Amino acid sequence: PKNHTIESYTNELISKQLPKVVESKLARSADVFCEPGWFGIDESEEILLAARKHGLALRMHIDEFCDGGGGELAAKLNVDTADHAHYTSMETREKMKQSGVNTGFLPGTPYSMGADWPDFNSMNEKEIPWTIATDFNPNNQILSLPFIASILVQRCNVDPLAALAACTINASFTTPHETNERHGVIAKGAVANLNILQSHQWESWCLSPGHSSVGSTVLNGKLLKHEL
C-alpha cells in the first residue's frame, strides 16, 4: 500500500489486521504470497508464525515467477499447502513432502500466461502429494475446475484419476474442517458432498472443455439440480 514499506506494512498486518481477523472469526487459515517483490522470506515467516500463535492453519503461495526459496520455508514451517510452486525444484518438493506439505498447482496461471508446465508425472512417481485449483483472479479469469483438470489431462498427460484425486481427497487434507468427518471421498460416514454426472463415463467431467457434464450436486446430503 502507499505510504508503507514492506517492513511497516508487515508490522501493521501482524499487530492490527491479524488480531482483528481472528477476533471476528473471519478465517481458519493464513496465506502469504511469498515471492521476490512481494513478501520476502523473512516477512513471510514473521507473518506465518504470528498467525500460528493465533491458532490459524498456515498456507503459502510460492515460486510463481521464479524459485524464490518459498518451498524451503514451507517445509521449515510445516504449512498445510504451498500453492503455485511452478518453479520449485524437485529437491525442494521432496523436502516439502517430508514435512507433510502439499504442493498446490494452479494450472490456469501458466495457461493464461503461456508458460511451461510443471512435470506432474514425476511428482506422481515420487509420490509427492499435490492438488489443483483455479486461481481465479483478474489475470486468470477461469472459474471452471473441470476446465483446469482438462488442461492437466489433455496438455500435461495426467491420468484423469490423478486429476480427480487432486481436487477431491487430496484437497480435503489441506483444508481445516470443523468436525473430524471425512471429506473428499464417497464412503460410509463421510460428508455427502458430491457431483452427479450426466454421462456414461466418469472421466467426462474433465474431458469436455467449455461444457459441464455435472447435472446435480449433493451438498451436505441435500440434492441440488443444475440448470443446463
Regions found by a protein language model. Give the residues of each.
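Conserved beta-strand segments that form the floor/walls of ligand-binding pockets within enzyme
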Residues: 29-31, 131, 218
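Active-site-adjacent C-terminal substructures of enzyme catalytic domains
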Residues: 57, 67-182, 197-199, 209, ...
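C-terminal cap of metal-dependent C-N hydrolases
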Residues: 169, 188-228
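Metal-coordinating catalytic core of metallo-dependent amide/deamination hydrolases
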Residues: 1-68
